[in-house]
Design a protein with these regions (language model features):
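Short hydrophobic/aromatic-enriched beta-strand-loop microsegments
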Residues: 57-59, 79-85, 197-207, 241-244
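Glycine-rich phosphate/adenosyl-contacting loop at the front of the ribokinase-like
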Residues: 1-58, 250, 316-319
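Conserved N-terminal subdomain of the carbohydrate kinase-like
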Residues: 52-148, 306-319
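Charged helix-capping and loop-helix junction motifs
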Residues: 135-139, 162-170, 242-248
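Conserved phosphate-binding/catalytic region of the ribokinase-like
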Residues: 212-319
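Conserved beta-alpha-beta core of the PfkB/ribokinase-like small-molecule kinase fold
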Residues: 150-210
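Anion (oxyanion) recognition and catalysis
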Residues: 51, 76, 174, 216
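Hydrophobic anchor at the start of a short beta-strand
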Residues: 6, 55-57, 82, 180, ...
Length: 319
């Protein structure tokens, strides 16, 4: 292990622009609130959650334009150090319009009765990344590995990057002796898993008991496959399934994917048992699912829900 800092990489970071509206409808003109700006992208969320739990983190990736400046400024306000490689293009933006019942600030609601209003989302595709910009990022990334305890690679790739980009980043980390957690899907995952990431986190819309084992055969040290708030993990030592009973969940919005990935990192570094890793990660994911209207709070997790649900997570070994 080279250092003490957990480096998160978000190659398609986003600036979330949030508005509160009196009513969401299909016709007419409606007043909206002053916009709220927040840095986003799954790797950014992972960095926020880890920082909230006291871990030393560094958020890296690609950022450009006014949106890129606002991304870095927002992370600085959260106490998250950054080392983004600057690009000429404008970092992507998402626009979210929250109806009645969603706090204008996007902060975590104090009570569940405020989790009412609908949210409309619109998202830009993101910038085109040139070969020169990728080369500069790769050089920056390799320098960061010297002080990294682990690297977390997350999310989609922006236009211009080859599909094997994550594979190269996994290889660089392995050469530096730094463990890698990869959270990706589609072609990005397909081209990276053979490079031997220590842990792969993959998402599927339906239960696929064979996916984790397949990822292991392709080269992953361990594979965690998520379906909503259920996680199946396959490792060299065996497999486990973790879930939270519906009776304990209460109000559930969309699972906190970034929070779940963040929850798997400490156990990977500290050698926790897999049941303990899964309890921590799934309780965090459920806490992240309680953010009002899908507008994530400052630390992207409801800590009270996390503490309550930690003992409710059921982990069962696979036969």
């Amino acid at each position: 292990m080279s250092g003490d800092v957990i480096v998160t990489v978000t190659l398609n970071a986003a600036l979330h622009v949030d508005y509160a509206v009196g009513e969401v409808g299909t016709e007419g003109t409606r007043p909206i609130s002053k916009p709220g700006y927040r840095a986003g992208g799954r790797g950014v969320t992972v960095a926020r959650v880890l920082r909230a739990f006291g871990h030393d983190v560094l958020a890296a990736g690609l950022a450009g334009g006014v949106s890129g400046e606002l991304i870095r400024e927002d992370l600085a306000k959260s106490g998250v150090p950054t080392a983004f490689t600057l690009i000429r293009g404008e970092s992507r933006r998402t626009f979210r319009f929250a109806g009645p019942g969603v706090p204008e600030t996007g902060e975590v609601a104090a009570d569940q009765d405020r989790l009412a209003g609908p949210v409309l989302r619109f998202g830009e595709a993101g910038p085109y990344i040139t070969t020169e910009e990728l080369g500069r990022f790769a050089a920056d990334y390799r320098r960061l590995l010297a002080g990294a305890a682990a690297v977390v690679l997350c999310g989609s790739l922006p236009d211009g990057l080859p599909t094997d980009t994550y594979g190269s980043l996994v290889t660089y980390a392995a050469e530096a002796g730094v463990p890698v957690i990869l959270d990706a899907g589609g072609e990005e995952l397909k081209h990276a898993v053979g490079h031997g990431p220590d842990l792969v986190v993959a998402e599927t819309s339906s239960a696929d008991p064979g996916l984790g084992a397949a990822l292991r055969r392709l080269g992953a040290g361990a594979a965690a496959v998520t379906t909503g708030l259920e996680v199946r993990v396959v490792t060299a030592a065996g497999g486990w399934t973790a879930q939270i009973p519906a009776a304990d969940l209460g109000v559930v919005l969309s699972p906190g994917r970034g929070a779940l990935v963040a929850g798997l990192v400490p156990g990977q570094l500290l050698g926790w048992s897999w049941p303990d890793r899964l309890k921590h990660a799934l309780a965090l994911a459920a806490g992240g699912a309680r953010v009002p209207g899908g507008l994530e709070g400052r630390d992207h997790v409801d800590l009270a829900a996390y503490e309550r649900l930690l003992d409710a997570v059921q982990v069962v070994p696979e036969p």
